[in-house]
Each structure stands twice: as structure tokens, then as C-alpha cells.
Amino acid sequence: MTQQEYRSPSQRLSKGRSMSLPKIFARNLRSLQNNAPPGKNINVNCLNVNSCSLSASPSSQINMACNGNKQDLPIPFPLHVECNDSWSSSKLNKFKSMFNHNRSKSSGTTDASTSEKGTHKREPRSTIHTELLQSSIIGEPNVHSTTSSTLIPNEAICSTPNEISGSSSPDAELFTFDMPTDPSSFHTPSSPSYIAKDSRNLSNGSLNDINENEELQNFHRKISENGSASPLANLSLSNSPIDSPRKNSETRKDQIPMNITPRLRRAASEPFNTAKDGLMREDYIALKQPPSLGDIVEPRRSRRLRTKSFGNKFQDITVEPQSFEKIRLLGQGDVGKVYLVRERDTNQIFALKVLNKHEMIKRKKIKRVLTEQEILATSDHPFIVTLYHSFQTKDYLYLCMEYCMGGEFFRALQTRKSKCIAEEDAKFYASEVVAALEYLHLLGFIYRDLKPENILLHQSGHVMLSDFDLSIQATGSKKPTMKDSTYLDTKICSDGFRTNSFVGTEEYLAPEVIRGNGHTAAVDWWTLGILIYEMLFGCTPFKGDNSNETFSNILTKDVKFPHDKEVSKNCKDLIKKLLNKNEAKRLGSKSGAADIKRHPFFKKVQWSFLRNQDPPLIPALNDNGCELPFILSCNKHPKRNSVSEQETKMFCEKVANDDEIDEADPFHDFNSMSLTKKDHNILTYSENYTYGKILYKATCTRPRHNSSHRSFFKDIIPEL
């Protein structure tokens, strides 16, 4: 290059390196301008993704607005050049050969210095109004799988490519070059689609410092690793504004010129779908990440509670004895008492069972209370009382259970003068007891203490089993099996398990318990027969004057039915089969509750809808009972005696944490816990009600065709 020739700073920096296609294009435009006939204008229109319009004046001035970056030139494709006046064919051929020569030299690693005809004088820059024209992706590749890319000189940006202002010479020659669309050909360094650079990441000086071949090699290596083809593989590029999918945009319609910065985009190093793939990858990573711990509120559980089978139902204790206010005494036994209490925070009422640790150790009943807690915590049945809280202090154990307003079923029977109920009503209560016993047997527990005193009446009138201190868990139980399709064999859960404990109420004891030969789950079906008999006739079948006579009657005498009350044959047959002295032949000893349900006595019972049926008796609060505010006022000023001081101590002690209890403590396995699930059906305290004696209202819609007592619900005693 001669000394008279002007060289820009970027050209000096690029000495010895390959020239990019934008520089070649700019140099050829200058050469084209120098060879233009005097007095003629050449308009160059570059239509691509980032296109602009360059006006070449007769004075060989190329005015470009690049916003301070002379190297930010548009990508010269699609490219088409025409003249507005007649040119000689030799000049056009010379320009064409010069352009192809420089384009072929740009693929090498070095650029030989070439001379350009004419003297370039640096003129002041002027703003070029450019317009962003969207290139159409509508095109039909030819047989050579190439896309024709042309640059069209026009007088107006938005004019049709085929229109040429002024007269066009017939010997004007169309200059075109082809850009490959085959993905396999993208490795060619001379491909113009790989030479464009992104002006956002490049400066004037760094544009020529990037090695083109290294970037192309890295790009194709990434493509081969990812197994993805070039984003331009199936696209056809066209410079026609008519075919543009955005030809109806406001900018094109109104032809408003805009001053924009031409952007150089390196398609090889930054494919069109890179940003989209990055977003999809981020979304995929976000989906794979686990939820944060702050989104999940896990209830606290002690180490011992987490090892229990019912650990998921409960959490660490949330109450203490001071959280409850005593209302009245519901009952008492040899080792504890049951109180009606009100929780201060929620205003809900519960039945709180308080057990004395010293008395339990003295009477060797530690294992019983542990079994009772396990059964209550494990059970989830509508006919078994619900345990809400259990905790212990230094001297007491506490079981906070659901309060059954109807009290003991035995008391409901005692409100009748005849002390009995009709057969249809007895069938209803017996059905619910069978469902509860079946559930316990499926869990592997034997109840062993079924009697009217341990059956409570819910506020809805349905029965609920309680007092599981005499229950036992069968060891080595098996899984239940299906027999006769719809019937479940529940006896198999405790098959082979026998115990020699002499427990239960003497009038309800089974013959095998009295003999001491050991007993199985069949003892519960014996007690069911005694219960049905007592509901129908008001007494037990083998009651004697003393315990020895009662045991003798159980072992030797058969069941007899009074003649003053009529019962169905199916009812008598059921009682006889349940009170069979031979355990192996007793009804329910083979298939458990399935044998009981198949009996004709329960033929019309809808076992799946027991909870939805109307109970015979509905407990109601009696207006003649003691008022609750008076009871509370008495509790605020108790009498100073040993009993009141002991009760006061029960509600003032501090709860012991599970992990703080020594393993040598006999009550180490008694868990302090609260039910996790909130129950919104719990009775709430109200000053408008009295929590004294209970009346049992009859449901008159129930059929009682076989009952000899026509005035069944007319002789109810108003008080307990």
C-alpha cells in the first residue's frame, strides 16, 4: 500500500491478519464509487437482520453513521449491486473480479497488501438515516442448496428491489454470490455468516484481535458435542421487503427514518437460539431443584416419637396441665380420675384422664397404660375415641381424649325402667360394636373388656369404645386375607396368639379365661354375645349370687331366654353361637368379624353406612342439671382438704420432655405428644349450656315392629 493511500486505524491494526467481510465490502464500495460515472448517484441498500442504507455520492464520499464506531458495519448479505446509468461491461467485470479476489483472500490466515486505485480523502462524517428491515425467512433453495443473497442499489429504502430509478442499461450486469445453507458447509472460514461480530461485546480495537478460525473451530466443536445442527440449516434468507413477515409494521409503513447503530452479529459463535436454549436450561434446572425448607412447615417431633408407628400423626406436645380448666369429675378408678376440662386457648372441652404414677407402679399397671396409649394413638375409627394430647409430669400421666356427651352406655340403659331396649335398637348398637372390634383385630389388638360401662355415647348418638387398659397386642400377627370376595378374614391377624391373663368383668368372662387355658381374639365375640343379651333383657345370662356361682354358671350352664320378651329366632341363634363354650366352634373364631356379618340377624344392616344412620338415642343436656358457671365458681374457691390439694397439683405440674426422661424410668415409653391434624368438630364451651345430667331423646323414625314395649321412650327417667 503506497504512502499516499489513506489507511484507517483499524486497517493498521489488522495488518498481517485476515480482513473481515465488512471491511472488504466497505473497500469495494469505495472502489465502486471511484469508478462511478460523473454526475450519477449510486444507492446501496443492505437488507439483513441489522440493515442500513449507504449513499455513494459522485465525489467518492461514503457517509456512514456508526455512533462513534467506524468498524460497526452491516453484514453484507443479502447483496445485490446495480447501476442507475449505463456502465461498460468491462468496469463491472473488473469490479466483480476484484470483489471475488478479495473475498477469496479473506479466508487465509494472512492478508497480502493490495493497492486500491484512486486517492481516498477523509471527509467529515454525516449522519446516515438507516432503517431496520426484517429479512424474510421465505425462500426456496435451489438445486445447489444455496440461497441467493443480493445487495440492491435503490433511491429509496422501501422501494421494490426490481425497480431502478432512472433508466437502466440493457447491458447492466447483475452481481450475485451464493451463501450455503447446508449445515455441513458451515465450517468454511470464508462463509460470511461466520464473520459477523456482536458490537456489544467488541470495541474498535478488539474487533481485529479475535482469531476468526479459532472461534469457528470452537463453535463447531460445541455443536458436535451437543449434537445440534446449525440454526441456519433450514432457513432461506431473502432481502425482499415484500416477503417480510413484518412488512405491515408502523416503521415500514410510515417510512420514518431512524438513527440506529448497525449491529454485527457473529452467527457462528452466538447462534440465534442461544438465548432461548439458555432460558429453557434455567427453567429445567429450576424444576429439578427441591423445594426450600422454608416452604414446608414440618412439625417438631422428639427422637422417640419419630420411632413410633403413629409418629406421623402427632407432634411434640403443645399443651400443659395449666392449659386446661377443670369443670367437673366424670369418673374415677383405682389409679386415676377422668375430668371434664376446658382448654383455655381454644375454648374446647375434652375428657382428661389423669393417672397417678405411684399407684400404677404399686399395682403393676405400667404396661396397661402404655398399651392404652398405643391403641388410642394408632386408631383412627369413628367408633373409637380420639386421642388429642398425651403427656406426663413428675407424678402424673395425662390422656386428653374426645368428650362423649352421652356418657356411658350403661347409664343410658339405666334410664329405662326395664333396663333394656328393643331388638332393632340392639341390632344398631351391636353393628357398630362389631365394626369397632373388627378394626381393632385388624390392627392386631384384642379388646378383652367389652361391657356397657366401656361404651360411650357420642353427641351424635353413635357408640365409641374406650378404656383399653385391659387390651393386649397379639404378637406374630399375620396379614389379613380375603375370603368369599367381599368378606375379610380378620381372625387371621391374631391367629395362634393366646394369653393366660385373668382380666375382664366377671359376668363377661369367657370360659377359656376362667379355666386359665389361654385365650385368643374369640373372647371378644363371647363378650359381644353377653352385651346383646343384656341390651335385650336387661341382665347378663350367667349372673350368680357371688363370683364363684357366676363362674360355675359360665362353665356349666347353657344360655336361656326369658319368656316375657319376644325376640326373633335369628337373634336367639346369634346369641347361642356367640356364647358357645367351645372356643373352636364359636362364631367368629374362624374368620373373625366376617362370620358375624354373614349371620341372618345382620342381613339388612348396611355396614358401609352405619355412620349415616339415625341412632336410637340422642343425648341432650338436661336443664335440671348443675349450671356450669356455678361449677367454675366453686372450682375457683375449692375446699382446703387433701383431695382438692391433690387435684390442684394435677393441673400445676410441668410437662417432662421425651428426650429428657431417663431410660431407666418405667414410663420412658410414654410419649408426650399432640395430634397434628386439627379437629373442628370438637365441642366448645358455652355459658348457655349446662354440663350436668343428661337426657336421652328418642329417634321416633326408627322401626320397632318386634318390640313388645310400645311405650319404649316414654318411661325415660329424667335424671341419671
Swiss-Prot record:
Keyword check for Mitochondrion, yes or no.
Answer: no
Please name the GO terms that the record assigns under molecular function. ATP binding; protein kinase activity; protein serine kinase activity; protein serine/threonine kinase activity
* Effect of loss of the gene: Simultaneous knockout of FPK1 leads to decreased phosphatidylcholine and glucosylceramide transport into the cell.
Q: Which GO terms describe its biological process?
A: phospholipid translocation; response to pheromone triggering conjugation with cellular fusion
Q: Give UniProt keywords alphabetically.
A: ATP-binding, Kinase, Lipid transport, Nucleotide-binding, Phosphoprotein, Serine/threonine-protein kinase, Transferase, Transport
In terms of domain of life, where is this protein from? Eukaryota
Q: Which SMART domains match?
A: S_TKc
Q: Could you tell me which species this protein originates from?
A: Saccharomyces cerevisiae (strain ATCC 204508 / S288c) (Baker's yeast)
Feature: compositional bias, Basic and acidic residues? 244-255
Q: Which annotated residues bind ATP? A: 330-338, 353
Which residues are modified to Phosphoserine?
Answer: 203
Where the record annotates domain Protein kinase, the positions are 324-602
Q: Is-annotated flag, keyword Protein biosynthesis?
A: no
Its Enzyme Commission number(s) read: 2.7.11.1
Give the compositionally biased regions (Low complexity).
230-241
Q: Which residue stretches does the UniProt record annotate as biased composition, category Polar residues? A: 1-13, 99-116
Taxonomic lineage of the native organism: Eukaryota, Fungi, Dikarya, Ascomycota, Saccharomycotina
Task: Please identify the protein, giving its name as recorded.
Answer: Serine/threonine-protein kinase KIN82
- What job does the chain carry out? Flippase activator that phosphorylates DFN1 and DFN2 and which is involved in the generation of phospholipid asymmetry in membranes by the inward translocation of phospholipids.
